[in-house]
A protein has these predicted regions:
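Class I SAM-dependent methyltransferase SAM/SAH-binding core
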Residues: 54-56, 60-110
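Conserved class I S-adenosyl-L-methionine
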Residues: 1-47
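A short glycine-rich, Lys/Arg-flanked "PGG" loop and its adjoining helix->strand segment in the class I
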Residues: 138-150
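Short catalytic micro-motifs in class I SAM-dependent methyltransferases
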Residues: 127-128
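Short conserved loop adjoining the S-adenosyl-L-methionine
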Residues: 109-117
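A conserved beta-strand element that flanks and buttresses the S-adenosyl-L-methionine
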Residues: 124
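C-terminal alpha-helical "lid/dimerization" subdomain adjacent to the S-adenosyl-L-methionine
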Residues: 157-217
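Core SAM-dependent methyltransferase catalytic element
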Residues: 220-244
Length: 244
């Protein structure tokens, strides 16, 4: 690992860690692929309908590829702050050349890059919002709302933190059964795995808090569309009659 610290920059701008992340692609697809396809189905577009979506914190593009495959006339803008992730993603996105572009965007700031249009049809996120502070989560949801066309949808797939210690123990017990390797990493982590875990849980918050952030931003149709233990797919839409 390039640095023995666990900030977002040290983790996700590390050549070593991003290399490990890329090498884990098959396991990531096995663990999360069904949810990415489900998110593609949640977007309210016909199979042959043309639309543009932004994928924030896109990493190497797993979610974008699921949407692009499901909706063959869609176009993706993938946003990430890590040159290393973008480099790996460019290689993985090649089957969709001409239908996507990458843009650099640090979600810890409120400044949206000009390469993301003022209005897009949908905005999705996967495995990234939990890395942001509460203040930035709220700010990001407001920014997403502002960048959606009226009727546009936002869908997020992310882990959440339980508020009840009994629930926490159940999640951990069942999660260990589903994925023994994750149990091993928690109980006997390498220095890199410990840094990634600390980074993973630092800003994780309960689901109800995030749904309130969506309501405060102005979304409607808010729901938890899928859930298994700490993993959730939730979202909402900008009202169709909202001023552009």
């Amino acid at each position: 690992m390039d640095q023995q610290v666990d900030t977002n920059a040290a983790i996700w701008q590390s050549n070593d860690i991003v290399g490990t992340w890329a090498a884990e692609a098959a396991a990531r697809e096995r663990n999360h692929g069904a949810q990415w396809l489900f998110m593609a189905d949640l977007l309210p577009f016909a199979d042959q309908q043309a639309f543009t979506f932004a994928d924030l914190g896109a990493g190497t593009g797993n979610l974008s590829r699921a949407i692009l495959e499901r909706h063959p006339r869609s176009a993706a803008i993938l946003a990430d702050f890590s040159d290393q992730m973008i480099g790996a993603g460019e290689r993985e996105m090649q089957p969709f050349a001409g239908r996507y572009s990458y843009v650099k965007f640090d979600l810890s700031t409120s400044e949206w890059p000009a390469a993301i249009p003022a209005k897009v049809d949908a905005i999705v996120t996967s495995l990234c919002v939990h890395h942001l502070s509460d203040e930035r989560k709220q700010g990001l949801f407001r920014g997403i709302f502002e960048h959606l066309v009226p009727g546009g949808w936002s869908v997020n797939y992310d882990p959440v933190r339980p508020t009840d210690p009994v629930v926490r123990s159940v999640w951990q017990r069942v999660g260990d059964r589903y994925d023994p390797e994750m149990a091993r990493k928690r109980l006997h982590p390498t220095p890199e795995e410990r840094a990634r875990h600390d980074n993973h849980v630092r800003h994780m918050i309960p689901l109800t808090q995030q749904l309130e952030y969506l309501r405060a931003a102005g979304f409607e149709g808010i729901d938890v569309y899928w859930k298994r233990l700490e993993w959730v797919v939730y979202g909402g839409c900008r009202p169709a009659d909202a001023a552009a």
